[in-house]
């Protein structure tokens, strides 16, 4: 009743009667009014729909903006601990292989797995810690349990696993133990050429992949190239010959053990190109399990220390040939010039003498074959400090070598603070200036190739060529003849390998004492050799640290009894591998023999 009273009439009588009096049709008027009202209703509904749609669009835009902002924040952040969800996208380029001069693999990549723990999924932390400690000797069960029950959500256990280790971990049956695929660096030859290759480790890491970075040796020197995707299919080729490297290391290790040496180094180099065919340092290490840096003791006692390019030693009488070669070049002497060998020489509170009495005088060639300190010192006095320094500098003895290894910068020669007459005389026979075995090999290569400087290299594709002329071909030829005489008539008779005409010079130098001066019971012995003398192709330098031959009643510590026989065995082993055919005609094609100078 109330609802009916409140209705508004669609056709009020007050409007109908006036309309009829005017002659209008009330039905048409009402129909038109209804049409207008319906259109107004539709327009209102359309406006309300548009408003609702706009609100929905604005709402979704706000939601997507918030999500995008959150994703951007997560992408740019660096979490304290890696998590699986944020690392799946880490993809690193494959590291290029390293091969020897014949294309044999020295370093490559191996697909493996890393082991990590998501602690929230651990069912039995104590049992898991115990089982892992049983599997890995370097893990402690209590330490693991403490980490498993801490607030950490993620924990690395092992960065790389062998298939056997992976299976053993899988057998534990713990859901919180997870495996992440990755590539690791593999050195298939173990410790062979370890000081050349150096080693690699992991840089940026994710649970699905890891970046391999070089930490030492060639791996570090050429790290950016090896990681460059454009080089990943092209291996880095070295000058090293794997077979020869193995032979050198085998003989060197045996000699080191037989002679009770503390360490050893050997370098085999082409005299015309500077290509290093073999470079060894002992003790060595396995780059697959590279040891940590030493925390105590001397750095050169560590197996990581490369004695061939980092070890700086007084190289003894091996230096004498440089003194004589310079004097010949300056025309101060000729091979037959008689040199006063009376001793001792007293200068500046120091006394210079020979190992044994060589008489009152010797010709220059015999100063070398008899290894006379007195004769060499007097020849050096003729040369003078300034010219001696210039000559040794031209041979590279005053700065680190340029070989392509990051460690080479550490092999900086130790020069005298004051290069006066006393230092000039002692340096002439290898005391007072310390250099690396690689310096010595480079200097002897210059003598062997006719007097031109060479640059030592480990890169097979390096553009090579002889450098500046340091000494004349005639002086180089005479120097080789004298070095051959050291083997046939002098202190290196054990180096006369049948068929290969070896030339060379021995060197024995006492080691500096921690209390000052020199320790007479400890020395460095070296032998620098060139072969074959009729067509010089290779130089071999062998250096032994604290070696001594104890086969007789008295220990023998000189190079003739230590470094020389080791060098001879290396030459006998590697010469056939180098393609050298022995000659047995006993003719020297140097063009000069000691008989030319003998009276």
Where are these regions (language model features)?
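Beta-lactam-recognizing serine transpeptidase/beta-lactamase-like catalytic domain environment
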Residues: 107, 266, 271-317, 322-547, ...
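Periplasmic/cell-envelope proteins involved in peptidoglycan metabolism and beta-lactam response
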Residues: 1-293, 312, 386-398, 551-599
């Amino acid at each position: 009743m109330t609802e009916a009273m409140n209705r508004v009439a669609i056709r009020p009588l007050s409007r109908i009667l006036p309309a009829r009096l005017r002659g209008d049709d009330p039905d048409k008027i009402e129909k038109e009014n209804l049409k207008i009202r319906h259109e107004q209703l539709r327009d209102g509904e359309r406006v309300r729909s548009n408003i609702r749609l706009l609100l929905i669009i604005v709402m979704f835009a706000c939601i997507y903006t918030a999500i995008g902002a959150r994703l951007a924040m997560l992408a740019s952040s660096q979490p304290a601990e890696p998590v699986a969800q944020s690392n799946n996208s880490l993809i690193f380029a494959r590291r290029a292989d390293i091969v020897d001069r014949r294309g044999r693999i020295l370093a490559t990549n191996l697909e493996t797995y890393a082991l990590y723990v998501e602690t929230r999924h651990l069912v039995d932390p104590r049992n898991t810690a115990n089982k892992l400690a049983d599997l890995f000797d370097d893990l402690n069960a209590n330490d693991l349990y403490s980490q498993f029950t801490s607030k950490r959500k993620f924990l690395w256990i092992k960065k790389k696993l062998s298939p056997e280790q992976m299976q053993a971990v899988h057998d534990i049956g713990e859901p919180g133990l997870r495996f992440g695929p990755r590539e690791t660096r593999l050195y298939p030859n173990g410790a062979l050429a370890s000081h050349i290759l150096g080693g690699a480790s992991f840089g940026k890491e994710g649970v699905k992949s890891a970046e391999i970075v070089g930490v030492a040796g060639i791996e570090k020197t050429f790290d950016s190239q090896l990681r460059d995707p454009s080089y990943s299919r092209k291996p880095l080729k070295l000058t090293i010959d794997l077979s020869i490297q193995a032979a050198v290391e085998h003989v060197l290790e045996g000699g080191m053990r037989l002679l009770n040496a503390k360490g050893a180094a050997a370098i085999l180099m082409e005299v015309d190109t500077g290509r290093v065919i073999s470079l060894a340092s002992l003790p060595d290490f396995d780059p697959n399990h590279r040891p940590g840096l030493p925390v105590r003791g001397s750095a050169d006692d560590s197996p990581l220390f490369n004695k061939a390019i980092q070890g700086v030693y007084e190289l003894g009488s091996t230096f004498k040939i440089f003194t004589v070669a310079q004097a010949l070049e300056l025309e101060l002497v000729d091979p037959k010039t008689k040199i006063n060998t009376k001793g001792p020489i007293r200068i500046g509170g120091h006394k210079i003498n020979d190992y044994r009495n060589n008489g009152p005088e010797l010709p220059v060639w015999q100063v070398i074959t008899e290894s006379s300190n007195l004769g060499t010192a007097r020849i050096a006095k003729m040369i003078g400090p300034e010219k001696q320094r210039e000559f040794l500098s031209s041979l590279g003895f005053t700065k680190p070598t340029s070989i392509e290894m990051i460690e080479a910068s550490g092999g900086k020669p130790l020069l005298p603070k004051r290069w006066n007459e006393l230092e000039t005389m002692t340096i002439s026979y290898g005391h007072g200036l310390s250099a690396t075995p690689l310096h010595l090999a480079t200097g002897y290569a210059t003598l062997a190739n006719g007097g031109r400087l060479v640059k030592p290299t480990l890169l097979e594709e390096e553009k090579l060529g002889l450098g500046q002329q340091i000494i004349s071909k005639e002086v180089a030829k005479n120097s080789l003849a004298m070095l051959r005489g050291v083997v046939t008539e002098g202190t290196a008779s054990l180096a006369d390998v049948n068929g290969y005409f070896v030339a060379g010079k021995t060197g024995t130098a006492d080691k500096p004492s921690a209390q000052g001066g020199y320790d007479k019971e400890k020395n460095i012995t070296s032998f620098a050799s060139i072969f074959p003398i009729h067509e010089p192709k290779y130089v071999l330098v062998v250096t032994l640290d604290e070696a001594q031959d104890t086969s007789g009643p008295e220990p023998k510590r000189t190079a003739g009894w230590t470094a020389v026989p080791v060098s001879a065995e290396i030459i006998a082993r590697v010469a056939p591998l180098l393609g050298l055919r022995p000659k047995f005609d006993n003719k020297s094609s140097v063009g000069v023999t000691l008989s030319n100078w003998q009276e």
